[in-house]
Amino acid sequence: MNALDLDTVLLSQDRDCLEILDQTLLPGTVRVLHLSKLEDIWEAIRTLRVRGAPAIGVCAAYALALEASRSRAEDAECFLRDLRTAKDYLATSRPTAVNLFWALERMERTARENARLPIPELKERLFAEAHRIREEDVQISRNIGRIGLGLLHHGDGILTHCNAGT
């Protein structure tokens, strides 16, 4: 298996769960978790099954979009209240993860800015924003790798600190 073929966090094709690479098992075992409940995603973030600030942010953004898609609210006020409840809960999963809070705030801002839309369209906007957050991080990671490659020479070693990138 090529490491470049692995995604740390993906939304399933039918958009009913997150597919998360369980990083606690690496490098010996590659296992993808399929998590649909907010509590299970919270636990995956809390227990470092998802590692690296950017990946945690992407995971939280998709989790919020998933949870919002299940809201039965019929008006924007109730929908935003449901979203805020899920956001506040997810924020407790890793109190030091900056990207977690940044992504959750960005998702809530997207909902507030689009609150005039019909609820089904608002839900779609949240999925689109979560996807945008993921794609931005993938592009940043690729750019870092491309630029960094030009700085390395045969025999150089690399020491990493923490995990980064989706």
Where are these regions (language model features)?
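Positively charged, low-complexity intrinsically disordered leader regions
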Residues: 1-39, 43-46
